[in-house]
Amino acid sequence: MKVVLLKDVAGLGIRGQVVKVAEGYGRNYLIPKGLAEEATPGRIKELARLDQAREERVERLAAQARKVAAGLKGLTVRIPARAGEGGKLFGSVGNKDIAAALAARHNLKIDRKKLELKEPIRSLGKFPVLARLHPGVQVEFEVEVVDNGT
């Protein structure tokens, strides 16, 4: 009996895979537990269509990430912050502040979770930031924290 796996099954296969199993194993265990369904020709075609749509979506997202990376490459983002004596900030500048500055000043909307800082920025100066936009697409840019003069 051929079944289409609806979830990953240890020792059998991954979600979406068509596998051949014993009749009893399929009918008495996999199908009732919602782990698989019978592989009909219509279902196999539908899975192929879904896989193709998923691949197109991933490629589209990768192309968007490459476009954003090109915009970020070599960019210096200036962020004003209140600082005390010696250039120490009152508070810190984090991913959230950098993402907000990118959206406001450069019209680049990037999820703050995709921005990596070695540590929170707690002083004035220039700091490198790594943006992991998509698997295989990452770019480093600079953040310059300046005193806002108040």
Swiss-Prot record:
One of its GO terms (biological process) is translation. Signal peptide: none annotated. GO terms for cellular component: ribonucleoprotein complex; ribosome. It holds the Pfam family Ribosomal_L9_N. Keywords: Ribonucleoprotein, Ribosomal protein, RNA-binding, rRNA-binding. The keyword Lipid metabolism does not apply. One of its GO terms (molecular function) is structural constituent of ribosome. Gene3D superfamilies: Ribosomal protein L9, C-terminal domain, Ribosomal protein L9, N-terminal domain. HAMAP family: Ribosomal_bL9. Belongs to the bacterial ribosomal protein bL9 family. Binds to the 23S rRNA. This is Large ribosomal subunit protein bL9.
